[in-house]
Swiss-Prot record:
This is Acetyl-coenzyme A carboxylase carboxyl transferase subunit beta. The keyword S-adenosyl-L-methionine does not apply. It comes from the Bacteria. A zinc finger (C4-type) spans 36-57. Binds 1 zinc ion per subunit.
């Protein structure tokens, strides 16, 4: 009889505990679902569609400039202009160059606004789209320069212009240079207007600060997306200044429509058709 016997063990699948753990707490990819900020429903991304509108409450999710371009412009019609203009750091603001570089790498944009020329249902127009994923689409010197150049190009070429606004206001890292863009862009809008040309602004969530106080409010026709936040100073600042409680819907697109600041509120899936119609109505047709 052997003094030592080989012990027998029951083999257990080493991955079993991991599998059981995953079954109890399955990992769901972050990009598969989205939570609506308004109704708090969890929505399957595919149900949002390319318009990114909540199917439960019609809340308009914030979208990038490239996503909006795909919704509004004719396919492959957009020709981007005035790229390669870089922001400087006039105040030597700590960390600003690094922030710009990181944001450019993350978004694939060179600045907070895309500018160029496109067609919408065959109607040619100059087009600018702000992108809130780029430092909250704050207006610095490059945003002001690109927009000014676009208005000058539209004036020379006798083109209408459409600007989609979305901004947290002036870019604090550029100080007074940023604030000067309000006057600069407004002057360019005025020259375009003096030439008898058509200008549409579409206010999207959020449009605030110096952008609201300048070119966003100067459109011949001002449209807005539903429930967009539109204003200059923040609600809390205003309440502390005037010492009054403001209405719940204060600074919402619907409030502004009721008080004459906005001409119409247009659903995102109807914007393309509405813009094409407005361009057609305001385009001169040469007599044949």
């Amino acid at each position: 009889m052997a003094l030592f016997q080989k012990k027998k063990y029951i083999k257990i699948n080493p991955n079993r505990s991991i599998i059981e753990k995953q079954a109890e707490h399955p990992e769901v990819p972050d990009e598969l679902f989205a939570k609506c900020p308004a109704c708090k429903h969890t929505i399957y991304q595919k149900d949002l569609g390319k318009n990114k509108v909540c199917p439960n409450c019609d809340y308009n999710f914030r979208i990038t400039a490239k996503e909006r371009l795909a919704i509004v412009a004719d396919k492959d019609s957009f020709v981007e202009m005035f790229t390669g203009i870089d922001s400087k750091n006039p105040l030597d603001f700590p960390g600003y160059p690094e922030k710009l570089a990181a944001t450019k790498a993350r978004t694939g944009l060179d600045e907070a606004i895309m500018t160029g020329v496109a067609t919408i249902k065959g109607q040619k127009t100059a087009l600018a789209i702000m992108d809130s994923t780029f430092i909250m689409a704050s207006m610095g010197t490059v945003v002001g320069e690109k927009l000014t150049r676009l208005f000058e190009h539209a004036t020379t070429e006798k083109l209408p212009i459409i600007v989609f606004t979305a901004s947290g206001g002036a870019r604090m890292q550029e100080g007074i240079m940023s604030l000067m863009q309000m006057a600069k862009t407004s002057a360019a809008v005025k020259r375009h207007s003096n030439a008898g040309l058509f200008y549409i602004t579409v206010l999207t969530d959020p449009t605030t600060g110096g952008v609201t106080a300048s070119f966003a409010s100067l459109g011949d026709i001002i449209l807005a997306e539903p429930q967009s936040l539109i204003g200059f100073a923040g609600r809390r600042v205003i309440e502390q200044t005037v010492r009054q409680t403001l209405p719940d819907d204060f600074q919402k697109a619907e409030f502004l429509l009721n008080h004459g600041f906005v001409d119409a509120i247009v659903k995102r899936n109807e914007l393309r058709q509405k813009l094409a119609l407005l361009l057609e109505l305001h385009t001169e047709v040469e007599n044949v």
